[in-house]
Amino acid sequence: MISVNDFKTGLTISVDNGIWKVIDFQHVKPGKGSAFVRSKLRNLRTGAIQEKTFRAGEKVEQAMIENRRMQYLYADGDNHVFMDNETFNQIELPGDYLKDELNYLKANMEVQVQSYESEVIGVELPKTVELEVTETEPGIKGDTATGATKSATVETGYTLNVPLFVNEGDTLVINTSDGSYISRG
């Protein structure tokens, strides 16, 4: 059990029959009445975000999440196959389970697979990935307005906005948390 006064961003807790990750929290001490903790939580099974208020000092159960390094192998229809780097066991996860992660997954990529009580609840990607541009419009010479962008499609099928100087065949470094262009690889 952990006190809500000890909340930190990224902490995982078990509340209301769900596994939740603390995204944001705020200790509130009103002039009248008792203190409380206002929190924003993400359900690790469904991805839903919920705001919840706890009384100061209230105890909640901390969820022990196991992270295992795994390698993404391939897509098998709608399923995606991962291999444990230590035991070489393979697991299959359905495509709808991975959601946004599919935009960045490519063969042989190392990821962290998160599980709670032997149930897989999520896949954590590296902070950045390098992906090759497969389709984009050619940059027009002299079109160098500050901050101008165009759309580009990378090898996974994901489309993002990139600077005008990016061409087909370039390798891009992409931020996996928001899908934005960082630099050329």
Curated annotation (Swiss-Prot):
One of its GO terms (biological process) is peptide biosynthetic process. SUPFAM superfamilies: Nucleic acid-binding proteins, Translation proteins SH3-like domain. It comes from the Bacteria. Gene3D superfamilies: 2.30.30.30, Nucleic acid-binding proteins. Its main location: cytoplasm. Pfam families: EFP, EFP_N, Elong-fact-P_C. CDD domains: S1_EF-P_repeat_1, S1_EF-P_repeat_2. InterPro entries: Elong-fact-P_C (IPR015365), NA-bd_OB-fold (IPR012340), Rib_uL2_dom2 (IPR014722), Transl_elong_fac_P/YeiP (IPR020599), Transl_elong_KOW-like (IPR013185), Transl_elong_P/YeiP_cen (IPR001059), Transl_elong_P/YeiP_CS (IPR013852), Transl_elongation_fac_P (IPR011768). PROSITE patterns: EFP. The keyword Transmembrane does not apply. The keyword ATP-binding does not apply. NCBIfam families: efp (TIGR00038), PRK00529.1 (NF001810). Belongs to the elongation factor P family. This is Elongation factor P. It comes from Staphylococcus epidermidis (strain ATCC 12228 / FDA PCI 1200). The lineage of its organism: Bacteria, Bacillati, Bacillota, Bacilli, Bacillales. The gene is efp.
